[in-house]
Amino acid sequence: MSAPAQNYKIADISLAAFGRKEIELAEHEMPGLMAIRKAYGDVQPLKGARIAGCLHMTIQTAVLIETLVALGAEVTWSSCNIYSTQDHAAAAIAASGVPVFAWKGETEEEYLWCIEQQLFAFKDNKKLNLILDDGGDLTTLVHEKHPEMLEDCFGLSEETTTGVHHLYRMVKEGKLKVPAINVNDSVTKSKFDNLYGCRESLVDGIKRATDVMLAGKVAVVAGYGDVGKGCAAALRGMGARVLVTEIDPINALQAAMEGYQVVTMEDASHIGQVFVTTTGCRDIINGEHFINMPEDAIVCNIGHFDIEIDVAWLKANAKECINIKPQVDRYLLSSGRHVILLANGRLVNLGCATGHSSFVMSCSFSNQVLAQIALFKSNDKSFREKHIEFQKTGPFEVGVHVLPKILDEAVAKFHLGNLGVRLTKLSKVQSEYLGIPEEGPFKADHYRY
């Protein structure tokens, strides 16, 4: 494939000015990314990096992209979801000169086309040498269709739980060809983005889509991992009566100890009025469950892919489907009752709203930037010696790695000032007593926060 005829394809370039205003607002709420620009801008640690990114093309992602560029990288971009692009964000990034191929409401074919287009949009027909992914679609495409691009690739960083599961499967099957950093399992990602991000953005998506009163409703949350915990807390905070389904006895016990009733989907499907899937698995809600649901049950997903809900069964077996408004469809079933599907079974917080807030995404994206630096500089011993926070980041073998604790703690520190947090300092005596450095890291890698 030759280089694209133009260096972007988006919905409307005239939205760029609007997008730029929102990017400027978001920058104030993303202190981690701004601190990284300040700390490493003069060093240009990503000079020479060519990063292909596949992640929701939102305002917050625009700040991430411009941070990578500010550190010296050349970047191309596509979205990792057909509904999640904010068109004004894509326009602002395109207007800044970054090749971006994304718009809200892509077809499946257009989605794959966009991912492939970005691979051939680097200057002088050069190939990528870093991948920044969310969900694994870009990683899979390059490994399966363009393996020659991996020859000079320093590695990849993966944003989300689903993509990390895919990476470990690739390792097991011997298919992963470059080092990968699991950004999702950084504490400042999984315990913040997954938990606190979902705690706010889930309800935002449901409310914008349906205007439903959640107080008093029976809400069913499938899965009680970090995402499920945030969703359950949000729904309970709105006054809903929350049921949880789980396969893992530890997570089930956690849910029970928090006061949630843990049931099976078979039982919950008869009484639930709002259903949220958070598992990263498939077939969580199937045809049998749809038939059992009460009138106008609301069904949505906040996991990465659309296979948690059997949307194909719904489309094949419904007597009628009426589109109420974008991303809100009402299906008539053989039971004579209706179900309301949000975002076509894809991410409800991005399909029906604008996703997580800027502040929590700053935590996640700070990890992404540090991961990209760690990969690109993994063989640069002088850089790692000068910047002690990167001493333990390389060289990397092919496999899946996590960022060291010192970088995780650094991300947290970047965000404390905006919240008015003042840290207590260890004394020398206390440091010696605990056996940890005065400046950290403060916890062992196995510590569970």
Curated annotation (Swiss-Prot):
SUPFAM superfamilies tied to this protein: Formate/glycerate dehydrogenase catalytic domain-like, NAD(P)-binding Rossmann-fold domains
GO cellular component, one term: cytosol
Top-level lineage group: Eukaryota
Pathway the protein contributes to: Amino-acid biosynthesis; L-homocysteine biosynthesis; L-homocysteine from S-adenosyl-L-homocysteine: step 1/1
Sequence positions that bind substrate: T58, D134, E159, K189, D193
UniProt EC number: 3.13.2.1
Molecular function terms from GO: adenosylhomocysteinase activity
Protein name in UniProt: Adenosylhomocysteinase
Natural source organism: Saccharomyces cerevisiae (strain ATCC 204508 / S288c) (Baker's yeast)
